[in-house]
Amino acid sequence: MATKTNHIAVVAENRKARHDYDIEETIEAGIVLSGSEIKSVRAGRVNLRGSFARVIDDEVFLYDAHIAPYEQSGKYFNHDPLRPRKLLLHRREINRLNGLVRMKGMTLVPLKIYLKGRRAKVELGIARGKKIYDKREDIARRDAERDIERALKRRIRE
């Protein structure tokens, strides 16, 4: 019997989300894709910038995630690149997410799409939007940490 490997390969990452939002918690969800969509995902032709997820009628959907049409299939057998895609979660997870998102200022943001074994997964972040001054504080903190690292490196060399 063949051994099972759960090799994880990140296909697309939403770096802007970590800059624009304060991520409270992350959750893994499956995603329902058609044949040409999964082929495009495996080829890495996914863009998550500006995408978001919503809970509608006890189901979670991913909106504005661009999965490019598959090159090798004809123009008639391809998918709509921006169609809403259903995310697969357990009922209790959906209810919990629905409760968290109803809180003021909370939203569901896809952080990355990756392949886990043969299946495509989405990492969702339960996030709160950052204010402009929060973003500036983060940048200043990163710059200060970088300066400290440089100073320590210089001191070690001497």
Curated annotation (Swiss-Prot):
GO cellular component terms, semicolon-separated: cytosol
CDD domains: SmpB
One Pfam family per UniProt: SmpB
InterPro entries for this protein: SmpB (IPR023620), SsrA-bd_prot (IPR000037), SsrA-bd_prot_CS (IPR020081)
BP GO annotations: trans-translation
Alphabetic keyword roster: Cytoplasm, RNA-binding
GO terms for MF: RNA binding
Subcellular location: Cytoplasm
Function: Required for rescue of stalled ribosomes mediated by trans-translation. Binds to transfer-messenger RNA (tmRNA), required for stable association of tmRNA with ribosomes. tmRNA and SmpB together mimic tRNA shape, replacing the anticodon stem-loop with SmpB. tmRNA is encoded by the ssrA gene; the 2 termini fold to resemble tRNA(Ala) and it encodes a 'tag peptide', a short internal open reading frame. During trans-translation Ala-aminoacylated tmRNA acts like a tRNA, entering the A-site of stalled ribosomes, displacing the stalled mRNA.
Family membership: Belongs to the SmpB family.
Cited PANTHER family: SSRA-BINDING PROTEIN, TMRNA-BINDING COMPONENT OF TRANS-TRANSLATION TAGGING COMPLEX
Protein name (database record): SsrA-binding protein
Organism listed in the record: Chloroflexus aggregans (strain MD-66 / DSM 9485)
UniProt gene name: smpB
